[in-house]
Amino acid sequence: MTLDISTLSSWIGKTETMQEQLSPELVGRFNATLGSNFSVEVGELAPLLIHLCLAQPALPADQLGEDGHPRRGGFMPPVPLPRRMWAGGEMTFFGPLPIGAQVKRHSTIRHIVEKQGNSGRLCFVTVQHEISADGTPAVREQQHIVYRGPPVTGGVIPDAAAPPEQGMYVRQIAPSPIMLFRYSALTFNGHRIHYDAPYARDIEGYDGLVVHGPMQATIMAQMAADLHGRPPTGFRYRGRSPLFCDQPFTVNATPSDTSMLLWTARPNGPVAMQAEAFWDN
């Protein structure tokens, strides 16, 4: 399949702006989904990365693709490769997101790059999100999305390298179908690999329902804040291999003075997602 990069590149600079109130009810649903206990009082600080649950596109079903994502060619470029994954991203935090604030997300297509991977052709699309709360800048995010070809025989994604030694701090997570369904609902994410097991296996070639990358990033960012005693000023993460529903995984953290390495992994490897949190001195 040929990628017409010159045509796809015409999407660079395209923008989209959406907004939504950060309600106490949303924080309550966030707590119920991830097992956290953040305050739901108006004016209190909302959990880290809850902005991923806010101001998401809400399109009618007839404007969605087979995979459950918005049909390409609107805000996102019409990349002809069938499978989409959240590859990673970087975030800079300028200020808090208070509960009750009106949150605006201004999104811009920044880069579109074609690469050749071990499993075939890839197309990376970078979207920059500027998040503000009641008009005050709060988060700048670079989101990296990768489009891939059809699954190859024998599995779509080979295992990555074995995980490093266990982190200084370790948390166990047992992802259930309910947890995945609830996080999809929180983020209004229609991607069927998270709740439609036959589709995930038979069409996209996964071993089962896939644990959301953004959910892993959220858990790691909050773990970093809890261990350090305050939220980071920067956070970056990269997906390496998938995690699956009903297969427990670990969240690992090893801190230093001004940063913290984090990763998720299956009990016997491989690493699923790597992250690093930063704090200004």
Describe every region a protein language model picked out.
Residues 2-45, 160-216, 223-226:
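A contiguous, surface-exposed recognition patch within enzymatic or periplasmic domains that forms
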Residues 200-258, 264-276:
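Catalytic-pocket segment enriched in acidic/His residues
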